[in-house]
Amino acid sequence: MVNLKCPICGGEITVEDDALPGELVEHECGAQLEVVKQNGKLSLRLAEQIGEDWGE
């Protein structure tokens, strides 16, 4: 298990060691976060909110 910090509220989040980049986790503050790997280390960033595309 790896302890990471929420980029929104600074709270601690425990993520599995085998978490993959792109995996989504939700923090108790309500933020939807994406696991990213930079320089061999896991970190979190705010997940992009993709809306529905109706072809307009």
From Swiss-Prot:
Name assigned to this protein: Alpha-aminoadipate/glutamate carrier protein LysW
Task of the protein: Carrier protein that bears the covalently bound substrates for arginine and lysine biosynthesis; bound L-glutamate is sequentially converted to L-ornithine, while bound alpha-aminoadipate (AAA) is sequentially converted to L-lysine.
5-glutamyl glutamate sites (modified residues): E56
Motif EDWGE per UniProt: ranges: 50
A Pfam family this chain is assigned to: Zn_ribbon_LysW
One GO BP annotation of this record: L-arginine biosynthetic process
Record-level Gene Ontology MF annotations: zinc ion binding
Modified residues (5-glutamyl N2-ornithine): E56
Gene3D superfamilies xref list: 2.20.28.160
Modified residues (5-glutamyl 2-aminoadipic acid): E56
Keyword Metal-binding appears in the UniProt entry: yes
Binding positions for Zn(2+) per the UniProt entry: C6, C9, H27, C29
Organism domain of life: Archaea
UniProt keyword annotations, A-Z: Amino-acid biosynthesis, Arginine biosynthesis, Isopeptide bond, Lysine biosynthesis, Metal-binding, Zinc, Zinc-finger
Positions where 5-glutamyl N2-lysine occurs in the chain: E56
PANTHER family linked: ALPHA-AMINOADIPATE_GLUTAMATE CARRIER PROTEIN LYSW, LYSINE BIOSYNTHESIS PROTEIN-RELATED-RELATED
Zinc finger (TFIIB-type) stretch: 1-34
S-adenosyl-L-methionine is among the record's keywords: no
Gene, per the UniProt record: lysW
Spans traversing the lipid bilayer: none
Quaternary structure and interacting proteins, as annotated: Monomer.
Organism of origin: Saccharolobus solfataricus (strain ATCC 35092 / DSM 1617 / JCM 11322 / P2) (Sulfolobus solfataricus)
